[in-house]
């Protein structure tokens, strides 16, 4: 948790601080620690995969698809209401909705990836590429034909990275661009 949660926050710092911290980084970080520890829901450890070097977490990624169980959303909402209380949780959900309308859920034959981050000292070593390739294999095993992601349009470094590994822009709904990459089915 000492290394995973900071990476989770790094994966979407501006967005997560706005939604979960209402502009306060520490508040967002505290929520993510609590949500990660629960295990379940969108920010729980059970929905993330990590890359390690010598038992130290240096990378993180998450994924979701069109057939998530209803419990997934309930677990996410429970982690929010347990941390913030009901009144403040409503505000958190409302802030989240301002972003959610610009994000596209994956279609039936797509696997969406997100929360991708690599520790500063481990970058440019192929870790992010390896994490994405791992998810591409997972997509194939699930019978999906493409991997999709939403990236903030201001994150030029991430956009360049995704394009370098074969992702193409599909559509843009500010402040996000959805990118997609086809994956060959298992033969």
Could you describe each region identified by the protein language model?
Residues 50, 56-65, 112, 117:
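Conserved beta-strand in the GNAT
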Residues 25-48, 53-54, 101-102:
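Active-site rim helix/loop that mediates acceptor-substrate recognition in acyltransferases
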Residues 67-68, 150, 163, 168-180:
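Conserved catalytic-core motifs of GNAT/GCN5-like acyltransferases
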Residues 12-36, 81-86:
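Conserved GNAT-fold acetyl-CoA-binding loop/helix
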Residues 67-110:
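Conserved acyl-donor/pantetheine-binding loop and adjacent beta-alpha core of acyl/acetyltransferases
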Residues 109-111, 139-152:
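Conserved GNAT acetyl-CoA-binding A-motif
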Residues 1-6, 13-18, 66:
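A short beta-loop-alpha structural element at the N-terminal edge
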Residues 115, 124-138, 160-164:
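Conserved acetyl-CoA-binding loop-helix of GNAT-fold acetyltransferases
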